[in-house]
Amino acid sequence: MPKKAVRPMPYAVSEHTKAMLCQALKKKMAQKSLDKITIRELADDCGLKRQAFYYHFQDIYDLVRWMFQQEAVSLLRQHDGALLWQEGLLQLLRYIEENRAVCRCALQSLGRSYISMFFRDDIHAIIHRTVDELHRQVHFLQAPGQGELLTQFYVIALAGVVESWVLEELKCSAEELVDFIDQLLTDQLRGAIDRQKEESLRLNRPQGGLAT
């Protein structure tokens, strides 16, 4: 006798179940390291069978990935205009501030490279748009690939600053950190623009006086 096909779970029910597992995970991450959390205890906390977890996620790391994509990365994507990157970053930092124990647990359990992969593409896109927009206005980039080099520099620097802030090595508010990053980025790009202007003036300056 042929086996009955497994009926797909309704979307709303599936999303509700994933949200329940996410909240259970956040509760546990505030108490202990990720490697001490089991799928069984997450399922038990949600009143689910262990198999229900595997219907939605491959493992706990897959649940962590979904959690950050749903709750944190989406904040950046809501503010992806070139003029709104500061607001997107501020919303992300406020999320981290509200979930600092969870983010610290993820950072310490998984490492910077694993966590940054969730945000790298979005932060890269935000900074790259800012650099491109300034270049369109004043043409300060002097060589092919210079914009990407500058973008990568700021992405790596920003990741390090945010990591230190998550670990509370930096004592400042989310607003103060965004203001600092904004000012640093603005000053550095303004310096590049000023150098480009000086170079243009030097190249266009007449060499010597007119012969008599």
Describe each model-derived feature in a short phrase:
Residues M1-K32, K36-T212:
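Alpha-helical bundle regulatory/interaction domains
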